[in-house]
Amino acid sequence: MVLYIMKWDIHPDKADAYLKWTQSAVKRTAVPGVVEFRAYRPASGSSQIAVTYEFDDMAAWAAWQGKEDIQKVLNELHTLAINVTTELWGPSPVVPAPVRPKK
């Protein structure tokens, strides 16, 4: 699995526009090739956002990243958010598969 992490702060002057934009942005980025999408906010309720996308492999991530509509969404994000960062993580050679506790 490949994990793509994005973090940002909602621009303080654009909170309403950001909330409206997210309704379409999530649908436009959660497309075939994405195994899972999740979004997080700090428990403190601040304007920070973290999202994760999981892909089967680097090729799936690269295909997703190369799509014109994905690039459009990312460009739009930069007009509504500040401090945007991204991280791309590949599988660990030490723990290549998930470890799930028994129930």
Residue ranges: model-predicted function:
Residues 14-15, 25-27, 39-41:
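Intrinsically disordered, low-complexity segments enriched in polar/charged residues with Gly/Pro
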Residues 2-9, 38-67, 103:
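Short, well-ordered beta-strand segments in beta-rich or mixed alpha/beta enzyme
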Residues 9-20:
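Short, surface-exposed ligand-recognition loops at beta-strand->loop->(often short) alpha-helix junctions
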Residues 14-16, 59-61, 94:
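Residue-level signal for secondary-structure boundary sites
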Residues 1-2, 16, 32-34:
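Short, flexible segments with low predicted structural confidence
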Residues 20, 24-36, 54-88:
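An amphipathic, aromatic/His-enriched active-site/gating alpha helix that lines ligand/cofactor pockets
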Residues 35-50, 73-103:
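Glycine-rich beta-strand-turn "strand-cap" elements at beta-sheet edges
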